[in-house]
Structures are given as C-alpha cells and as structure tokens.
Amino acid sequence: MADYQGKNVVIIGLGLTGLSCVDFFLARGVTPRVMDTRMTPPGLDKLPEAVERHTGGLNDEWLMAADLIVASPGIALAHPSLSAAADAGIEIVGDIELFCREAQAPIVAITGSNGKSTVTTLVGEMAKAAGVNVGVGGNIGLPALMLLDDECELYVLELSSFQLETTSSLQAVAATILNVTEDHMDRYPFGLQQYRAAKLRIYENAKVCVVNADDALTMPIRGADERCVSFGVNMGDYHLNHQQGETWLRVKGEKVLNVKEMKLSGQHNYTNALAALALADAAGLPRASSLKALTTFTGLPHRFEVVLEHNGVRWVNDSKATNVGSTEAALNGLHVDGTLHLLLGGDGKSADFSPLARYLNGDNVRLYCFGRDGAQLAALRPEVAEQTETMEQAMRLLATRVQPGDMVLLSPACASLDQFKNFEQRGNEFARLAKELG
C-alpha cells in the first residue's frame, strides 16, 4: 500500500471516477485539488467544500506544482500540459493504478476492442455462482476504487487502453486481450500498433495470459509463452466444436457445454464464453459453477439485444458497436431469412470502414447511414445505401419497407457522441422507435 501523506495531489477529471479518487485521498488524510476541462462537470456539486477546484480548462500552475497527478482516461497523455508535467518528472497515474496498489485480493483483468463488458460481467457471474465475494467494475459499472473492500475475495476489472496507459502495478491472476481492431484512432496518431502497445500492458506481471488464437495482435510482444492459454473459433485450448449440426464449447479436447443450453447466441458470444471460462479456470473458480453461469446469463443491454419481434421482423439493438470490429463481429456468420436493414453511422473516430465491405455484398442487404460519417459509410455500397441526417429519419424510412423474415439491425460501427449523449441513449432511442414503428 502506498503512502500519500504530505503529497500535493491533483486530480484531472470529475464524474464518478474523479469523485472516487477524491474520496480515496480524503480517506487517507490528503486533500487533493481537482480540475476539469468542462465548465460544469458531473459531480461538481458533490465535491466537499475543502477541495479546491478549477473548471473550464486545465490549470498548468497546479499541475507543475504537483507531486502526483491522477489523470482521467478521458485526457490524452500527449496533451501538452501533461507532457510538460511528465518532462518535469511529475508522476502521472490513473485510478486503476491507485486501485492496484491497494487491492489485497486477486484481480482478473480484461481488455479488448470488443466483448470486454460481456466477458467481465460473465466472469463476475461465474464467481457469484461459486459463492465467491466478487467486485466487478472498472471501465463498466462502478469505478475500481469504489470496489475496494477487505471482504472481497476476487476483483474482475474491465480495463480500457486509456486506463492501461497509466497503470504499472497491475499483477493479474489472469489477464486477457480479447481482440484488437481499430478504435480510438483519434487518440493513437501512430496507428494500430500504438493502440495495441497500450493494451499489451495488461500482460505485464500477469500469472496467466488468455490470448485469442484467431488474432495475432492479442499475443504478448515476444509471442506466446508458458503463461499463455488460448481461445478461438476452431483452434486454441478453448474452442468451438461443430458436430451433427450442434455446437459445443470444448476445452483441451473435452466437450463441456452445448451452446443450445446458453441464453447468449451468435458466434462472437460463444467465443466470449470461451474467454470467460478460460479466465475463470485460471482464477481457480470451480468449472461446474462457471458452466452453470453460462446457462443463465442473458447478455447485456445494447449488445446484439433483440428489442422487438413483431410481424415476423426482428429489431436488434447493437448500439454498443462503436467501432468497425464490433460491427464485423455482429455481421460475421449472421443469418437472416429476408432482408437485413443495417443502420450505420455516427462519429467514426478516424477509423477505416473498408473491412465492413465484405459483409455487405449480399442481395439481401440494405444500408441506412446517418450522422457525421454517414456519407463515408454509404460509399461502402452506394447502390443499396440511403443517407439521412439522423437515425430516426433512417428508421422511419426503413419501417415502410420491412417484410416478414427481415431483420433491422442497429450496429453503427461508430461512436454516438455526434448526436447522442452516449451509446446507451442511442440504443434506448432505437428501442423506443422500434416499438413505435414495428
């Protein structure tokens, strides 16, 4: 456990995570200063009066006088103010680093471009099924510092690449990178390898590394070593087995669960289940209770969630598909009897959309593209694409065309922030319109 007594601590970024950092230091007798680039950040009204605050920008004078800066994942380390502080030798960490210095129980750590929330939640459910007192959070749900508890027997953390950049004390009992596809390229000007390098930090000091046999970018930089366990579609220690029209989860040659016993569906969810099982095994959770959790877990909202089935039409909310790889995962192996009406659009975060093209070739595909990067997405296959300003306009247009056997799929391949508060609001709006129009 670290000692922060007498340290001049500055926290950048408020919200729930920022407040958890403030509470963390106050509980240790240290009163931090807080700054946020927003004029009225969420949580400002909850700051104790004793805590000095600066809003509407960064305060370089405070930063350069600090002994320790706790930076929100929302601010790039390349920001000139943070670069100057780093050059001056000032320590810069994030909330996950503070957590790792304090946590007394083993940590299962999960990152990846797609699927990480599902896998994190699943491993948490596996632990609960085994009767283990587990804390689940990080990049989803509760901030990590709010999970700290002497009674906790296991922590399961979802970690973003931004969080990993400021973390050096993580020693996970099991860690995984589920996949690496282009995302947040606006924060990684040197491209995919720079983004991957941030993700790879999760393996440092990990006891077991769970890698994706189908994605070489998830391997440690020097290749697989004795710490590595793999999962994949057709290969890996944990893989899918297809026999007589049925699909099984298989571990090291042994069939352990028929996927028809699972509530989750789709190949991407079956591989998520394999990854979760590998992590649970590595953390020492009993296999039987982990498999039981797989049969009861229904999935998370906004992740290939069927929100309406009416008149033979399925309306599917995959609003969490905020990048190309996530939409690829939704389209890969997708079977639709009639026409697929695919809603794409939003803020593409400087991504390359071309990998989607191979999934859009069928005669039964229609594209409805909206938002900031709608034109770029419509250009993937202009002859079957319609472009509108908003998602609502697109949905009202397609609603006049759907037939029994069709699927309406919101899997936008983009962030939502150009037109929505977050992906949840976008997904809720889709669900509301589906119920109105379907």
Swiss-Prot record:
The keyword Cell membrane does not apply. Its EC number is 6.3.2.9. It catalyses: UDP-N-acetyl-alpha-D-muramoyl-L-alanine + D-glutamate + ATP = UDP-N-acetyl-alpha-D-muramoyl-L-alanyl-D-glutamate + ADP + phosphate + H(+). The keyword Electron transport does not apply. Its main location: cytoplasm. It comes from the Bacteria. InterPro entries: Mur-like_cat_sf, Mur_ligase_C, Mur_ligase_C_dom_sf, Mur_ligase_cen, MurD. Keywords: ATP-binding, Cell cycle, Cell division, Cell shape, Cell wall biogenesis/degradation, Cytoplasm, Ligase, Nucleotide-binding, Peptidoglycan synthesis. It is found in: Cytoplasm. Pathway: Cell wall biogenesis; peptidoglycan biosynthesis. One of its GO terms (cellular component) is cytoplasm. GO terms for biological process: cell division; cell wall organization; peptidoglycan biosynthetic process; regulation of cell shape. It is an enzyme of class 6 (ligase). One of its GO terms (molecular function) is ATP binding. It holds the Pfam family Mur_ligase_M. Disulfide bonds: none annotated. ATP binds at G112, S113, N114, G115, K116, S117, T118. NCBIfam families: murD. Belongs to the MurCDEF family. This is UDP-N-acetylmuramoylalanine--D-glutamate ligase. It comes from Escherichia coli O6:H1 (strain CFT073 / ATCC 700928 / UPEC).
